[in-house]
């Protein structure tokens, strides 16, 4: 499988295996094998970034958590918590997906439920960050 090089400063160790023509990646947090899709490749980079680089406990990293939004169930990609409080909401897209205002609006809707202090939109190549304070988003440059 040809995986794109993503825009992360660190290089991580990956456990990847093939089975019946499909590729799977081991998810450290959920302790399971997941089909390796382009979006999952990005999500796993963020998981490794927060766990191995930022030294967050795996228990503070919630992946594909269900939330209720306007009577429908949605799944967020990654929520970083601190003492069970939402801190950073990460919305992952496949590398070929552009980060558009629609992607931001989707993430902001999810955050209307969660109230995380920061959101990150990422396709693995580009990262957009916004702080959420007093009901408003303030975009800022991504800093490693």
Regions found by a protein language model. Give the residues of each.
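A short, conserved, highly charged catalytic patch centered on acidic carboxylates
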Residues: 1-118, 125-144
């Amino acid at each position: 499988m040809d995986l794109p090089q993503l825009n992360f400063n660190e290089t991580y160790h990956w456990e990847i295996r093939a089975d019946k023509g499909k590729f799977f990646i081991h998810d450290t947090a959920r302790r399971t094998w997941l089909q390796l899709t382009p979006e999952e490749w990005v999500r796993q980079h963020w998981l490794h970034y927060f766990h191995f680089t930022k030294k967050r406990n795996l228990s503070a990293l919630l992946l594909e958590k269900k939330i209720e939004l306007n009577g429908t169930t949605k799944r967020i990609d990654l929520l970083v918590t601190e003492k069970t409080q939402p801190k950073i909401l990460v919305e992952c897209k496949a590398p070929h997906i552009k980060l558009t205002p629609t992607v931001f609006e989707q993430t902001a809707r999810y955050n209307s439920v969660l109230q995380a202090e920061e959101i990150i939109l990422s396709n693995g190549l580009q990262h957009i960050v916004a702080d959420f304070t007093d009901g408003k988003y303030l975009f800022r440059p991504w800093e490693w």
